[in-house]
Amino acid sequence: MTNGSFRQIINQLDMRWRRRVPVIHQTETAECGLACLAMICGHFGKNIDLISLRRKFNLSARGANLAGINGIAEQLGMVTRALSLELDELGALKMPCILHWDFSHFVVLVSVKRNRYVLHDPARGRRYLGREEMSRYFTGIALEVWPGSEFLAETQQIRISLRSLINSIYGIKRTLAKIFCLSVVIEAINLVMPVGTQLVMDHAIPAGDRGLLTLISAGLMFFILLRAAVSMLRAWSSLVMSTLINIQWQSGLFNHLLRLPLAFFERRKLGDIQSRFGSLDTLRATFTTCVVGAIMDSIMVVGVFVMMLLYGGYLTWIVLGFTMVYVLIRLVTYGYYRQISEETLVRGARASSYFMESLYGIATVKIQGMAGIRGTHWLNLKIDAINSGIKLTKMDLLFGGINTFVAACDQVAILWLGASLVIDNQMTIGMFVAFGSFRGQFSDRVASLTSFLLQLRIMSLHNERIADIALHEKEEKKPEIEIVADMSPVSLETTDLSYRYDSQSAQVFSGLNLSVAPGESVAITGASGAGKTTLMKVLCGLFEPDSGKVLVNGTDIRQLGINNYHRMIACVMQDDRLFSGSIRENICGFAEETDDEWMTECARASHIHDVIMKMPMGYETLIGELGEGLSGGQKQRIFIARALYRKPGILFMDEATSSLDTESERFVNAAIKKMNITRVIIAHRETTLRTVDRIISI
């Protein structure tokens, strides 16, 4: 037997008393199947995160069916068995196993005891259900999964190290060093203060020496003033550090987010992305408020422990014993605390996504009479998030109560034992009072340090959420080349172009060969759902093809660079958006320097200039992010004007005139045709199709 095979067998052995099934929440809207497999793999010792699974098995926003999950499980070295069964037969399954849930979801069945079912839901976390609710959602399909001969228990997790995050901040090391030095001064003063109290009680008071009392008091006052001044300086330095971290982390992550491929956003909910971005604030707050304090707590724990040994002898070990009770309680309950923390974040993000979705579709909500339903559903989601937060608060209150109780017991025990030592003349009153002060500092510092260390572990949760954005591969950016934006027509060609949404789905199109000459206008037609918009996004460089090439003027757009290619083209898509600002800013792309004459010409070509001029503020008219106050046709004409303002060599239009009346559509098509630029159009209207040189059906 080789060392490698022996190591594999050792990894597969589980010598623990109990195998846990981890709770893993899905990130994308349709990756519940991947999350279920990640949980089962974790149960059998293969700790693999969703980022790793996603990179290996690229699923689309449409998700995967049971056959797809079965195929992925086999590639992970698992053995599977699909079953159709009744609810009463669930207890006979090999658990954990995967259940088909509510005809559109997958969950992991962890255990069945009497009529109590424990599930790990990728969308909601750990759930305890009764028979009635199980009967309502279980579809009768289950998938048993267990390790096969090729299964390897290992760790495959992609994460961001805290060190790399810290090292990426300019000026952080100098600021940290300053804060550390100031903290040393403050903590040294804290150690001196009890000694001053002891000197007063053991020397100044028994001797009746007012001069010594005055000298000690003056010295203590000096140290108090010094501590206040240094504390203010440290607070200012902490503010500087917090600002440095906040700006650099958030700007870096936001810039990275904007450069991610379109598919990343299509598979996620906006509220979840916003929640993950907000995890930066938690990391920043934890780092700026706790890291330096934790370092000083560590130093002080050692220093105070030594002082306690010098002053109290064996009393120190009693204090240590009481303190360890609290530490052990926190360590034992950490797993549950982390699980609730993650559920709170996920449920809050889900409620936020639903809230934003309702606002974006407010017109539909009103027209369809869905206000009551949407309001009730949002309230239920919010209550779920609040309940998770309440659980977290309860645990914090419980820990606070336990800490107070343990500290009180410790204080009473030390009071009795210490007073006995004083009565027996084995300790002076001053030493006893000083020891009590050191005891309080030791207990508080250990409790604070324990909370920080556990908080540091909780930070890994936020780290994982940020990693989903930060470690996602962004679009490749090539060095910018000089491109003259003068509407010179360019050629467009595809060779053996193929695309499918993911490895589990059929190809949308394959072996596609197109050729569009410079200045030619081509219309792409086909039945709804045939893949016209998907093809348009591939041609625009928004989606990357599985195989084949897209060539512009004979150059592969990947070789040219998507960033350079986008400077040569303009697109008007079905789901285009206006941004909060003026009409001028939207047409000119919020550029600092604008060409008003060309802007007006583009607006005239789009048949929107006269409409804009009738508005009280003309081109300075403000519009909201949803384009309030504008009709669908007016928005589309502004979209077209915005595209023309870029002076593109190719203009892509996906149903760009579908909301226009016949006269406006005829005018816009004629005006664009006169510009003699290359056009690729998706359209169904005969009036638009008559303006093109060639029609391609797919």
UniProtKB/Swiss-Prot annotation:
GO terms for biological process: bacteriocin transport; protein transport; proteolysis. SUPFAM superfamilies: ABC transporter transmembrane region, P-loop containing nucleoside triphosphate hydrolases. Residues 26-145 form the Peptidase C39 domain. The keyword Cell membrane applies. It is found in: Cell membrane. One of its GO terms (molecular function) is cysteine-type peptidase activity. InterPro entries: AAA+_ATPase (IPR003593), ABC1_TM_dom (IPR011527), ABC1_TM_sf (IPR036640), ABC_transporter-like_ATP-bd (IPR003439), ABC_transporter-like_CS (IPR017871), CvaB_peptidase (IPR033838), P-loop_NTPase (IPR027417), Peptidase_C39 (IPR005074). Signal peptide: none annotated. The active site is at 32. Its EC number is 3.4.22.-, 7.-.-.-. The chain crosses the membrane at residues 33-53, 90-110, 289-311, 315-337, 397-417. Residues 176-458 form the ABC transmembrane type-1 domain. ATP binds at residues 526-533. Its main location: membrane. It is a multi-pass membrane protein. Keywords: ATP-binding, Bacteriocin transport, Cell membrane, Hydrolase, Membrane, Nucleotide-binding, Protease, Protein transport, Thiol protease, Translocase, Transmembrane, Transmembrane helix, Transport. GO terms for cellular component: plasma membrane. Disulfide bonds: none annotated. Pfam families: ABC_membrane, ABC_tran, Peptidase_C39. Residues 492-698 form the ABC transporter domain. Probably involved, in conjunction with MchE, in the secretion of microcin H47. Belongs to the ABC transporter superfamily. This is Probable microcin-H47 secretion/processing ATP-binding protein MchF. It comes from Escherichia coli.
